Amino acid sequence: MLFFSLLCTLPSLGRTIDVGKGKAFPTIHDALKSAKPHDEIVVHAEKVYKEHLLIDKPIILRGVGLPIIDGSLQGNVIQVKANDVVIDGLQIQHSARSSRIDYSGLHIENARSVIVRHCVFRANQFSIMFQNSRHCTVIHNNISSNIVQNAIMGNAIHCWKCDDMHIAENVIGHNRDGIYLEFVNASRIEHNKVSGCARYGLHFMFSHFNVYRANFFSHNQAGVAVMFAHHVTMLNNVFTLNRGSSSYGLLIKELQYSTIKGNRFLDNTVGLLVDGGSDLFIKHNEIKGNGWGMRLISASTNDTICENNFLGNTFDMTTNVSYNCNIVNGNYW
């Protein structure tokens, strides 16, 4: 009797629906129309799927052999407007491009618990865009773009008004910004490799209580920027080979109550620029081979800069501020 009761309380498992030549459905669109919540749609890499998809129910959309979904340079390629969706193992390419509208390979809006994993994004204006979403994961994806015109170049991973996002172990290159967060809180960005972006490898604005750790940022034209935020933790990242007249390993602008610890700033024009930082804890960083190792400017107050290694910089540290209660102690020069 107890066994029967347990069976009755278990949720029903979804079906598996195959898409491809000789399968149950020839197109993903038709499979989505037939699918019920929590079904798994398996897309086989037997052709290029020139489709535009709207996912409005909780499903798993999984590719076998990295099938290509091609938007033919029209609109968003895939739109997600449901919770509990998994996008797995697809190549998503050729969204529309516009200087007026932000098109994307994968557009997720007003959703929670969406997972994007093991996908390849190519030649999209924005690759992955989240709006008003939470509890989402972007992991193990490869993202790049061939767009070179600034007016239509978008970001690889773009999050706006989101909470509790996990962005990890992605390889990103050749976008405007690699990872862009605006009004994004309580999120983790870790173990990503971002290089060759036309602006910032990582760009935070108005985003609080976030952690980014063990990321590798190189050859990004403006470096990395964390701006107008508080309670941000930056641990064990590498910022290297970000060079130019307005390029920094890490640019801090109006940041409060944050920790910068265990990072490496290597061979940048400016390793670390702190402009208007207050109550920052900057410790155990390696700042090596930069033009300026660290610049502390403007109204930066109550910052603790201690036990960092400054090695082989043209200028280890420069400042244009008076004392302002900053503590600089125990560094190696």
Question: What label would you give each PLM region?
Answer:
Residues P37, V48-I60, I69-V114, F126-S133, ...:
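Extracellular beta-strand-rich solenoid/capping regions of secreted or surface-exposed proteins
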Residues R15-H44, V48:
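Acidic Gly/Asp/Thr-rich repetitive segments characteristic of extracellular carbohydrate-active
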Residues G71-Q79, S99-I108, A123-F130, N150-W160, ...:
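Extracellular beta-strand/beta-solenoid scaffold signature
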Residues T9-P11:
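N-terminal signal peptide c-region/cleavage motif recognized by signal peptidases
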Residues K23, K47, L53, I59, ...:
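Residues at the loop-to-beta-strand transition
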Residues V42, L54, I60-R62, D70, ...:
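Extracellular beta-strand solenoid repeats
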Residues I108-S113, H118, F130, V184, ...:
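Extracellular beta-rich repeat passengers
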